[in-house]
Structures are given as structure tokens and as C-alpha cells.
Amino acid sequence: MKVLWAAFLVAFLAGCQGKVEQVVEPELGPEPELHPQADWQSGQPWELALGRFWDYLRWVQTLSEQVQEELLSSQVTQELTALMDETMKELKAYKSELEEQLSPVAEETRARLSKELQAAQARLGADMEDVRSRLAQYRSEVQAMLGQSTDELRARLASHLRKLRKRLLRDVDDLQKRLAVYQAGAREGAERGVSAIRERLGPLVEQGRARAATVGSSLASQPLQERAQAWGERLRARMEEVGSRTRDRLDEVKEQVEEVRAKLEEQAQQMRLQAEAFQARLKSWFEPLVEDMQRQWAGLVEKVQAAVGASATPVPSDNH
């Protein structure tokens, strides 16, 4: 009889433990006004849109523990979708602007650069979509991991963070490679233009010099020699002017490339800092959950032991 009573008590306590009281999710208040980072206020429109996307994620991460489950609500998903669409729209416009600047470059080079920029744009969109889908999976993953050990929970969390960091670093490295290809293509087009100008004007200058020498040797008239020399000087001045304009254009392209490189490096550093902050925030989310699970399990064990001990105590007899 005591054994049956102990088994019934254990089953009853286990059933009570299985019915975990659900936490009432408070409603999100009005979304605060978001601003792009100060460093991106003077950047390209697509950079400002991407800054608003990351600012929104940072705001979501600063929510209190009582509203963490609201991260998966339809409102957050809709906001992220709108910011992603805005970023991709501005990025397409910036890509069209770059293609117009590459008009002096050869058709083959321009097509290659356009294809590579389009691939980088697709990878950026895929990574942003992965961030949104990963937020949507957190609730189901937490519910699935409630019955697992602490070590397995921490291992899965660390694995997710490592994958996110590697992906961000890989995207930054790929953007730097695309920038190097763009710089090489611009320099190649400018140098090709200078060479073509030299090839066209070189024979004219030589022809002018030869004609001036012929006229000077055949005619002894001083005015004719002066006119020939003046004509040669005008051709030389024209060639130098064209060469100077080409060099100025090349310097301008180099300056633009350096500005883009500096912006990408700054964004890479910001993305690394955001990844580290995101990792620390996730750890602070999951550690209280693990500690609460341990306390509940310890309380359940103590209740079962107390119940078994109470049922095992012999009842004193009235007969002496």
C-alpha cells in the first residue's frame, strides 16, 4: 500500500510540473523614433537604409526580459520586412549610378563588374532574410530545448553565434574584393583611354613635325617656318591638354574608390561590434532560463523525496 501511495504521489507531482504556467506577454508600446548612426548620415542612401535596419535590430535587443517573446510577433516581422525592402531598393539605385559612372570602361569589363555587384547584392539580401528568419525560430528552439541539458543548450547557442560571425566576416571580405575589382576596372579603362588618345595624336604630331621640316628646308621664307612651328606647338599643347584631363579624371576615380573603401572598412568594424554585442545579449537571455530550470528540477526532487520519506515513516501502535 505504501508503494502504491508513493507511486501515485510521484505521478501527481510530475503532472503538476508538466503544466508550466504560461507567462503573459505584455504588448509592445509605440515604437520609438529610430535614427541612423551619426557616421552614416553623410553616406549613400542605401547605407542609410541599412543603418536603419541595424538600428531597429539593436532596439529590439534592448527590450526587457518581460517582452522578449514579442520579438517573434507579426509587428516585428513586418517592420524588418519593410526595412529590408527599403535597403534593397536604395542598393539597386546605387548600383545603377555606378553603372553610369563606368560608361567609359570597355563593355566586357562593365558587364563583369555589373554581374559581380548584382551577386553581392543578392548575398546581402539573403543574409538580411536569414537574420529575420532566425529571430522567427527562437521561440520554437527555446521550447524544444527546455528538456535538454545545460551543456547542450550552451553548445547550440555558441554554434549559432559562430556561424553568424563567420557570415558577417565573409560578407565584409567579399565586399572588399568587389571594391578592388571595381578600382582595377576603372584604372584599366582610364589607361586605355589615354593610350588611345596618344595613338591617335602621335602620328599627327609626327606628321606636323615632318611637314614643318620639309617646308623649312624647301623654302627659305622665315614666315612659313614660323607658321609651321606654331602649328606644331598647337598640336603639342592640344595633346598635353587632353592628357591632363585624362589624368585628372583618373585621380578623381581613385579618390572616389578610396572613399568607398573607407566606408566599407568602417561598416565592417561596426558589424563586428554589433555581432559581439548580439552574442553578449543572447547569453544574458538564456542564462536566467537555464538557472530557473535547474531550480524547478531541484524543487521537484525535494518534493518527491519529502513525500517518499513521509510515506515510509511507520505509524505508532496504540497497543502496549
From Swiss-Prot:
Span list, region Specificity for association with VLDL: 281-293
Q: Where does heparin bind?
A: L164, R165, K166, R167, G232, E233, R234, L235, R236, A237, R238, M239
Methionine sulfoxide carried by residues:
M145
Q: Which residues form the signal peptide?
A: 1-18
Q: Residue ranges of region LDL and other lipoprotein receptors binding? A: 160-170
Q: Where is this region: Homooligomerization?
A: 269-320
Which subcellular locations apply to this protein? Secreted; Secreted, Extracellular space; Secreted, Extracellular space, Extracellular matrix; Extracellular vesicle
The yes or no answer to whether the keyword Repeat is present is yes
Give the region (8 X 22 AA approximate tandem repeats) as residue ranges.
Answer: 82-199
Q: Name one GO molecular function term.
A: heparan sulfate proteoglycan binding
Residues with the modification Phosphoserine, per the entry, are S149
- Give the matching InterPro entries: ApoA_E (IPR000074), Apolipoprotein_A1/A4/E (IPR050163)
Residues in sequence repeats: 82-103, 104-125, 126-147, 148-169, 170-191, 192-213, 214-236, 237-258
* Cellular-component GO terms for this entry: chylomicron; extracellular exosome; extracellular matrix; extracellular space; high-density lipoprotein particle; intermediate-density lipoprotein particle; low-density lipoprotein particle; multivesicular body, internal vesicle
Q: Where is this region: Lipid-binding and lipoprotein association?
A: 212-293
Q: Which UniProt keywords apply?
A: Chylomicron, Endosome, Extracellular matrix, Glycoprotein, HDL, Heparin-binding, Lipid transport, Lipid-binding, Oxidation, Phosphoprotein, Repeat, Secreted, Signal, Transport, VLDL
How this protein is processed and modified after translation, per its record? APOE exists as multiple glycosylated and sialylated glycoforms within cells and in plasma. The extent of glycosylation and sialylation are tissue and context specific. Glycated in plasma VLDL.
GO BP field: acylglycerol homeostasis; cholesterol efflux; cholesterol metabolic process; chylomicron remnant clearance; high-density lipoprotein particle assembly; intermediate-density lipoprotein particle clearance; lipoprotein biosynthetic process; melanosome organization
Main subcellular location of this protein, as a coarse class: secreted
Family per UniProt?
Belongs to the apolipoprotein A1/A4/E family.
Q: What does this protein do?
A: APOE is an apolipoprotein, a protein associating with lipid particles, that mainly functions in lipoprotein-mediated lipid transport between organs via the plasma and interstitial fluids. APOE is a core component of plasma lipoproteins and is involved in their production, conversion and clearance. Apolipoproteins are amphipathic molecules that interact both with lipids of the lipoprotein particle core and the aqueous environment of the plasma.
Q: What is its quaternary makeup?
A: Homotetramer. May interact with ABCA1; functionally associated with ABCA1 in the biogenesis of HDLs. May interact with APP/A4 amyloid-beta peptide; the interaction is extremely stable in vitro but its physiological significance is unclear. May interact with MAPT. May interact with MAP2. In the cerebrospinal fluid, interacts with secreted SORL1. Interacts with PMEL; this allows the loading of PMEL luminal fragment on ILVs to induce fibril nucleation.
- The entry's protein name is Apolipoprotein E
Species annotation: Saimiri boliviensis boliviensis (Bolivian squirrel monkey)
| Gene that this sequence comes from | APOE
